[in-house]
Amino acid sequence: MRTFTAVVEKCPDTGLYVGYIPGFAGAHSQGETLDELRRNLNEVVTMLLEDGEPTLESEFAGLQTITVP
């Protein structure tokens, strides 16, 4: 079993949740709910892994909060 970190945002125009796996080309999806997005991302990643072991272009390192004056 493999674990990947997804970045998730909510589109203000459509109201959809949009997610992607940083550094994993093609690993992105959307859904009306967070559960739907999770299922969709799982399906996409499973399909991509079936096509062969991915070469990750980068690795998730974390999040930073930036405060500006």
Protein language model regions, located:
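Short aromatic-glycine-(Arg/Gly/Cys) micro-motifs in beta-strand/loop hairpins
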Residues: 9-24
